[in-house]
Amino acid sequence: MSATLELAKRLIACASITPRDAGCQGLLAQRLLALGFQGEQMNFGEVDNIWLRRGQKPPLFVFAGHTDVVPPGPPDKWLTDPFTPEVRNGLLYGRGAADMKGSLAAMVTACEHFINVHSDHAGSIAFLLTSDEEGPAINGTIKVVETLQARGEKIDYCLVGEPTSQKQVGDMIKNGRRGSLGGRLIVRGIQGHVAYPHLADNPIHSLAPALAVLCAQTWDQGNKDFPPTTFQISNIQGGTGATNVIPGEVEILFNFRYSTEVTHQQLQQQMEEILSQQRLNYELEWTLSGKPFLTAPGSLMTAVSQAVRGITGIDAEFSTTGGTSDGRFIAPTGAQVVELGPVNATIHKVNECVAVADLEILSRIYSRILEILLTE
């Protein structure tokens, strides 16, 4: 069994459902401390965070990742126990195999190989690990970054191990992410009997024209780096459950995934104008989960693409599609940030898995990136 596979299995065996770490960071720290890293716990609330650094000279290269996982769902739907890692037909099964314990294992073994060969490498290497990525993400990476900034610790390069690959490892790399703006809209009417609509005011009927406008709205055209901004309704709740009662209010939850062509303030203003035009009695709450970020072509993107090409022969595609990541907290510091990890076809699904061979490829890619940036 390879060192990467062994470590990945040990991590998967830790039932670290967010915000629990369940011992993952301890396993990783043990391996990294043996390489000369210095560890520092930065726990906030019920969230475990750790910052491990080797060296004090610039440039500082950071591996960033999360040890928490989403709930596995019904265990009886899995081929294997979600927290008993098992290899079947060349695939490692278990919750977190692809998102992102496989990446974490590959990062550590990449460092072990790199430092064994280049013990006197240039610059510094660090790990930023949190158990609060799959949850609210308020006591995790963002708090560690704030602590580092307060004491003047500057990150130059950051590689986040999110599962970015589509069909084979390295075919897609994220060099940015869209912003995420969520909201909760409550429209109030007057409850009543469905047989007497003139004595009531149905908020669902009142809201329907506004929803049609919102769903058909073109918010922007996107640009060469980002697709157009999208608006999606995720939940609608209204009524008592009875078929003969007009509801007194309706609630919707929605989300914008937005490009750099528009700000979250502009989206808020546009939506409020649409709602006001319909003369609705409404209440609106906003939640900004993250602003869009983009890493421009530079030394990190060059190193990552060269490493992928050298190990796999693939010319990787850079993209900003997909969900948010903790890169949104690191990029505003001025760091170059990219994301590269395993194939994402099974993440957050029953029977999450990763190809065993891909773990070794990923470890080699990570090690090669370090060589390009810290020795050449």
Curated annotation (Swiss-Prot):
What does the cofactor field's note say? Binds 2 Zn(2+) or Co(2+) ions per subunit.
Q: What EC number(s) is this enzyme filed under?
A: 3.5.1.18
Which reactions fall under this protein's catalytic activity? N-succinyl-(2S,6S)-2,6-diaminopimelate + H2O = (2S,6S)-2,6-diaminopimelate + succinate
- At the top level, the lineage of the source is Bacteria
Q: Name one GO biological process term.
A: lysine biosynthetic process via diaminopimelate
Q: Which InterPro entries match?
A: ArgE/DapE_CS, Bact_exopeptidase_dim_dom, DapE_proteobac, Peptidase_M20, Peptidase_M20_dimer, Peptidase_M20A
Binding positions for Zn(2+) 1? Answer: H66, D99, E162
Keywords, in A-Z order: Amino-acid biosynthesis, Cobalt, Diaminopimelate biosynthesis, Hydrolase, Lysine biosynthesis, Metal-binding, Zinc
Q: Where is the signal peptide?
A: none
Required cofactor(s): Zn(2+); Co(2+)
Q: What class of enzyme is it?
A: hydrolase
> Catalytic site residues?
D68, E133
- Gene Ontology MF: a single term: succinyl-diaminopimelate desuccinylase activity
Name the positions where Zn(2+) 2 binds.
D99, E134, H348
Any matching Pfam family: Peptidase_M20
What's this chain's function?
Catalyzes the hydrolysis of N-succinyl-L,L-diaminopimelic acid (SDAP), forming succinate and LL-2,6-diaminopimelate (DAP), an intermediate involved in the bacterial biosynthesis of lysine and meso-diaminopimelic acid, an essential component of bacterial cell walls.
Q: What family is it from?
A: Belongs to the peptidase M20A family. DapE subfamily.
- Subunit details for this protein? Homodimer.
Its recorded name reads: Succinyl-diaminopimelate desuccinylase
